[in-house]
Amino acid sequence: MLANLDRYKIVLASNSPRRKELMTGLGVDYVVKTLPDVDESYPDTLQGEEIPLFIAREKAAAYQSMIGPEELLITADTIVWHEGKALGKPVGRQDAIEMLRSLSGKSHQVITGVCLTTREWQKCFAAVTDVRFAILDEDEIAYYVDHYQPMDKAGSYGVQEWIGFVGVESISGSYFNVMGLPIQKLYRELKQL
């Protein structure tokens, strides 16, 4: 379906198993390149979708010297935006528990910034999904944190895991964005290249 991409070697710059799964599901041939320590900090003045867009651009800049002449680099960053602040990946068990407590019974936004970068140009976009959690009790939160892998996920949860099954009341927008890559929007952007 994306024959226009034949002129590119697609490079996904991500360690995320969910992003790899989604790219594979899209049916696009790609390779993965990762750098060990890409800085994911951002200026305190940024708000909402500005944050993951900034980080996705910074990730692309870190890979700039590695981009070959025929390569199309895909970088992305996902945050949970809740009550006026960004929730990234938790720094430990207690942080994960506190994040999930703060999301319990409330709505938040999952925002992913994506950059498509070649040696000649860059196109970036963001996707926003509204998610509402049911009220989670302390046992449910502790069970999830202790039996699943919240530490590599923005907001301390994976919608495709147990917490998503029992905790997510509603989603407005892309489910796959909540997983870490707005794959439908990415497909549309790739189709226009």
From Swiss-Prot:
What InterPro entries would the database entry show? ITPase-like_fam, Maf-like
Under catalytic activity, the entry for this protein gives: dTTP + H2O = dTMP + diphosphate + H(+); UTP + H2O = UMP + diphosphate + H(+)
Is Hydrolase among this UniProt entry's keywords?
A: yes
**Cofactor requirement:** a divalent metal cation
Q: Which Pfam families match?
A: Maf
Q: Principal localization?
A: cytoplasm
List the signal peptide residues: none
EC? 3.6.1.9
The site (Important for substrate specificity) lies at: 18, 78, 160
Supply the alphabetized keyword list: Cytoplasm, Hydrolase, Nucleotide metabolism
The processes (GO biological process) annotated in the record are: nucleotide metabolic process
Q: What class of enzyme is it?
A: hydrolase
GO MF entry, a single one: dTTP diphosphatase activity
| Catalytic residue list | 77 (proton acceptor)
Give the location in the cell: Cytoplasm
Q: Name one GO cellular component term.
A: cytoplasm
Domain of life of the organism in this record? Bacteria
PANTHER family listed in its UniProt record: BIFUNCTIONAL DTTP/UTP PYROPHOSPHATASE/METHYLTRANSFERASE PROTEIN-RELATED, BIFUNCTIONAL DTTP_UTP PYROPHOSPHATASE_METHYLTRANSFERASE PROTEIN-RELATED
The UniProt family comment states: Belongs to the Maf family. YhdE subfamily.
NCBIfam families, A to Z: maf
Q: What does this protein do?
A: Nucleoside triphosphate pyrophosphatase that hydrolyzes dTTP and UTP. May have a dual role in cell division arrest and in preventing the incorporation of modified nucleotides into cellular nucleic acids.
Q: Protein name, please?
A: dTTP/UTP pyrophosphatase
Q: To which species is this protein native? A: Bacteroides fragilis (strain ATCC 25285 / DSM 2151 / CCUG 4856 / JCM 11019 / LMG 10263 / NCTC 9343 / Onslow / VPI 2553 / EN-2)
